[in-house]
Design a protein with these regions (language model features):
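N-terminal membrane-anchoring alpha-helices
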Residues: 1-58
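Mobile, glycine- and charge-enriched loop segments
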Residues: 45-76, 213-229
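Short acidic-hydrophobic surface loop/beta-edge motif
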Residues: 49-55, 184-191, 281-284
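Membrane-embedded segments
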Residues: 60-164, 168-171, 176-179
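Structural motif
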Residues: 62, 93, 195, 227-229, ...
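Active-site metal-binding loops of divalent metal-dependent hydrolases
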Residues: 68-72, 98-100, 130-133, 184-185, ...
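Binuclear metal-dependent hydrolase catalytic cores centered on His/Asp/Glu-rich metal-binding motifs
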Residues: 139-140, 145-178, 184, 190-232, ...
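Conserved beta-sheet core of the metallophosphoesterase superfamily
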Residues: 235-284
Length: 284
């Protein structure tokens, strides 16, 4: 057996390598803590984004507040920060575009309380997101899954069968005065402006036209002088057709501006857009 003796130079190189690895580990830990901290703070503060949209169908100013992807979060005790800000803005209409609840939460009382308070501020509409669907439907709302559940095919499909499914969240929301739109529309008059709002339940591109197409066409092509607002959670179906296919104003959520966000860089990954997606921004 041969013995090996490390030279002084080799020992020095090993010490340098160990020091480098230890330093690298500390840097990675520090970066991870910074990212987690920034995301934690960001998830407990909301940022407002204002958009101005013009339409010849509007006779007076209409202020709409869109709230999306809260995931059962509270901004201050009993959501006081969010409530106070919404009240101060004095909206004419409030639209919740899904994932206000969190499928892992034990209770939706916080969401119901928020919606009840804001229903006294302005007429409110609620559209289901994937978290609501996960909680109250036993299948993903794709065409394949829905057809299999109901025994449908292209020749016998009855979209209204899906709408016959009721759930506790809808009952509680509507008891507060919030209207839940599931592949249906409603009309509201704000000042002298008539507004039609359509809420999409089957936002998956595979099931949108087969389960919402008939009611959506009726919404789009009746009362054409009314302002048309289409509200949806997952926006992918909007990319399937030209913007003028969806009405005068489109409201969506879901992407959060990135599932993981790096400070100063932005979204690292979204489950729809992959790594370093072009999509970004604040949706709440």
């Amino acid at each position: 057996m041969k013995g090996y003796t490390l030279t002084t130079k080799t020992k020095k190189n090993i010490r340098v390598l160990k020091l480098f690895l230890i330093s690298l580990i500390f840097v990675l830990i520090a970066v991870s803590i910074a990212i987690i901290g920034c995301n934690y703070i960001g998830n407990r503060n909301f940022k407002e984004t204002f958009y101005s949209v013009s339409s010849l169908k509007v006779n007076n100013k209409v202020r709409i507040i869109q709230i999306s992807d809260l995931h059962n979060c509270s901004y201050g005790k009993d959501n006081i920060k969010l409530l106070d800000r919404v009240k101060k803005l004095k909206p004419d209409l409030i639209v919740y575009t899904g994932d206000i609840v969190d499928s892992k939460a034990k209770s939706n009382d916080r969401v119901i309380s928020l919606c009840k308070e804001l229903a006294d501020v302005a007429p409110s509409y609620y559209i289901y997101g994937n978290n609501e669907v996960e909680m109250y439907y036993d299948i993903p709302l794709t065409q394949e899954s829905l057809d299999k559940k109901f025994g449908f095919n292209d020749n016998n499909r009855q979209p209204d069968k899906l709408l016959e499914i009721t759930d506790d969240l809808t009952r509680k929301l509507e008891a507060t005065g919030v209207k839940v739109l599931k592949n249906k529309s409603d009309t509201i008059t704000i000042g002298t402006t008539d507004v039609d709002i359509y809420g999409v339940l089957t936002s998956n591109p595979s099931s949108f036209w087969s389960y919402a197409g008939e009611s959506f066409d009726e919404y789009m092509y009746s009362n054409e002088n009314n302002l048309k607002i289409t509200a949806i959670h997952e926006p992918l179906v909007f990319e399937e057709y030209s913007p003028d296919s969806w009405g005068d104003l489109m409201l969506a959520g879901h992407n959060h501006g990135g599932t993981v966000k790096i400070p100063m860089i932005g979204p690292l990954y979204t489950h729809d857009g992959g790594f370093l997606p072009d999509r970004g921004g604040h949706y709440v």
